[in-house]
Amino acid sequence: MAPPSVFAEVPQAQPVLVFKLTADFREDPDPRKVNLGVGAYRTDDCHPWVLPVVKKVEQKIANDNSLNHEYLPILGLAEFRSCASRLALGDDSPALKEKRVGGVQSLGGTGALRIGADFLARWYNGTNNKNTPVYVSSPTWENHNAVFSAAGFKDIRSYRYWDAEKRGLDLQGFLNDLENAPEFSIVVLHACAHNPTGIDPTPEQWKQIASVMKHRFLFPFFDSAYQGFASGNLERDAWAIRYFVSEGFEFFCAQSFSKNFGLYNERVGNLTVVGKEPESILQVLSQMEKIVRITWSNPPAQGARIVASTLSNPELFEEWTGNVKTMADRILSMRSELRARLEALKTPGTWNHITDQIGMFSFTGLNPKQVEYLVNEKHIYLLPSGRINVSGLTTKNLDYVATSIHEAVTKIQ
């Protein structure tokens, strides 16, 4: 008799929640259905948007007979890496001028986080540092915990961030947790448009955060998934990163071009490394090359070419910033409209946090039972945490969503 399958004992894993939500939405025949769970931009017609500048650059690339499908270098397309790091740090960055910046092209922001985490587990502040505490915000994007765990870190902790009572930033809790963190701990920071809360520190608050991190010798690992997409202004959205450079920090910054270029399925990311001197950057990149080689060997070219072509051409860059502002402005408009409708309905509670928050997501303050009501009774799909994708709102579904939220809050405590 043949033995059972070698896979017979493999347990069924739980589905990834945000993707399951979208699958459930697609299967729902109800005409009123609204998807506020998806982590991607939508137009006012609820469609994905291919940026006009991306279409233009794709055509340009298709017509360029000098291009081929040869392997890229292990660390990626040099022009892309340079342009991406410059976008985060700014043209006048002292770190760039002093040649103490390196970049690694990655498979999206997640790939940048993973390569950075793998490197830190092996080489940060010595060797084999898997017992170094890694701090993530409470709450945070769920993949942060998973990526650092998969890299081998054994001590992942949270720092206070969201104050549910006031629906805003718990700055004092945040600072206290940093103050009490062991020296040389790694701290994951959202550069802008915090996911899932949409609440960002002000520049003055960032200065306080940097001050504590500096005297505790904490290592910043920025996650920058929304530059330009949060406020519509590239410089404003990179303020924290650039301030940390000015304060002399060494740090990593995982960049994603999924949102601000709409290149979700091209997996375009970059890990920017800022060090103290050029020599250390060369050493870091030499080790990252080894890690990339056994992870994805080398990255795909198409998305990187699109981003590099756009960022390096002044005319295309200007068009791109206009496209980004179009997306950011629509989201800001939907925030205002949702808040206005909830206040007009006299929905219990305060709703100013919707417009105080920034970026694609809003932490509504709805509890899991209210979310369950919206999903099951109203066919409005959102995460159990109450996080919504504001770009899932449109001029056509706003009234329905607002009255449904009003019902959920009024009926269910």
UniProtKB/Swiss-Prot annotation:
Organism: Pan troglodytes
GO CC annotation, single: cytosol
Record protein name field: Aspartate aminotransferase, cytoplasmic
Molecular function via GO: L-aspartate:2-oxoglutarate aminotransferase activity; L-cysteine transaminase activity; pyridoxal phosphate binding
Cofactor: pyridoxal 5'-phosphate
Gene name of this polypeptide: GOT1
Major site of localization recorded for this protein: cytoplasm
Top EC group: transferase
Keywords annotated in UniProt: Amino-acid biosynthesis, Aminotransferase, Cytoplasm, Phosphoprotein, Pyridoxal phosphate, Transferase
Domain of life where this protein originates: Eukaryota
UniProt similarity note: Belongs to the class-I pyridoxal-phosphate-dependent aminotransferase family.
Other comments on record: In eukaryotes there are cytoplasmic, mitochondrial and chloroplastic isozymes.
Modified residues (N6-(pyridoxal phosphate)lysine): 259
Biological processes annotated in GO: 2-oxoglutarate metabolic process; aspartate biosynthetic process; aspartate metabolic process; glutamate metabolic process; glycerol biosynthetic process
